[in-house]
Amino acid sequence: MKMRKVVSAMLVAAMATGMVAGCGSSSDSKSDKKDAKGKVYYLNFKPEQDEQWQDLAKEYTKETGVDVTVLTAASGEYEKTLKSEMAKSNAPTLFQVNGPVGLASWKDYCYDLKDSDVAKQLTSDDFALMDGDKMSGIAYVIESYGIIYNKELLKKAGYSADDITNFDSFKKVVEDITANKDKLGFSAFTSAGMDGSSDWRFKTHLANLPIYYEYKDEGIDNTDAIKGTYLDNYRQIWDLYINNATCKPTELSTKTADDATADFVTGDAVFYQNGTWEYNNIKDVGDDNLGILPIYIGVEGEEDQGICTGTENYWCVNSKASEDDIQATLDFMNWCVTSDDGVKAMCKDMGFTIPFKKNLKSDNVLVNEANKYTEDGKAPVSWNFSTMPSEEWKNGVGSALTSYAADP
């Protein structure tokens, strides 16, 4: 227990020190194949949508004659891959940054999008990533994350979502499931894997909650002045995850995203922290059985909290590319968000809510459940992790979380 207290202090230091230190129409985009000029090279951030982007690229090439190459970075490796690819002669023409912090590294490579056709399709200027008067990026998806749950298993345990309104009530349900897991045949949580395919869920997405609440309290919007007010809350939700899961806390360093997905899909766990993007991987559970809860961490007034909703996905066009390639890339982007095929692929096949005029009602039950919280007057939690100082900072938090879990 003494070592656990030491590692707990390391976790506080990793967060607090890092924070202070860091601190048109579809026809517009169509062209005759014989007149096709330029090419598109898209470095995709989302491994879970790789297949859909590959299919969409082929469809666009078939329709226009413009070559579209899609390379998908491995989970957690996007920045490293982007640096490597940008150093090549055939660099990506379309890439993405996660917000202001990510933009700082790539702003000299960003073409000004403010006069582009795709910018005119945005439903709000809030979805543009600005660098002064320059529109350096455009959000292409709005997503939500929280605690996905299996309604049937929760009912079997004797509860419903109505019984969970804050951290204390959630803790009661979770620990009761753990106390009866042998009889029930399932655990409360999926594994909180801390390998590279899964650790972002906790070192980034879960860490957003204490940052969000301190930003809200202090009226700040960056980590320079943060004090770490809610780090104890961060620790207690992490304790709940790792002590009531399908595996021992000491095993988390080798557990993967696929392990957690399998835990959930096979009915071995009720709760699974993830987001709307995970729908295609878990839809076999059945739409009637899928729900999503806010991530409660024990903050006063959290009964009025909704789901974490926002974006860290901003398209940027490489200003160093040739004029033909830049135009081809702009045309491809516009086609994706205006054409029937493009919009269907993004909204239906990828399950996205897109911040463009032709967004379709989602078939993704997690999107609709998340939206219902807002419709019911619950306050969505903004995504503030794009203001985290660096990937190195996040990795420091991840290492502290892993060490903390490994201490018996």
Region spans (language model):
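Extracytoplasmic/periplasmic solute-binding protein
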Residues: 136-140, 145, 171-223, 269
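C-terminal capping/gating helix-and-loop segments adjacent to ligand/active sites or protein-protein/ligand interfaces
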Residues: 139, 309, 349-355, 369-408
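A structural signal for short loop-to-beta-strand junctions that line the ligand-binding cleft
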Residues: 85, 92-93, 119-154, 187, ...
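Extracytoplasmic/periplasmic substrate-recognition and gating elements
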Residues: 62-63, 157, 246, 284-349
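Conserved N-terminal structural module of periplasmic/extracytoplasmic solute-binding proteins
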Residues: 4-11, 21-102, 118-120, 253, ...
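Glycine-centered hinge/linker elements that transmit conformational signals in sensory
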Residues: 174-175, 220-253
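Hinge/lid segment of periplasmic solute-binding proteins
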Residues: 98-149, 201, 205, 291-294
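Short, solvent-exposed loop/beta-turn-alpha elements that line the ligand-binding surface or hinge
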Residues: 112-126, 189, 193-196, 211-236, ...
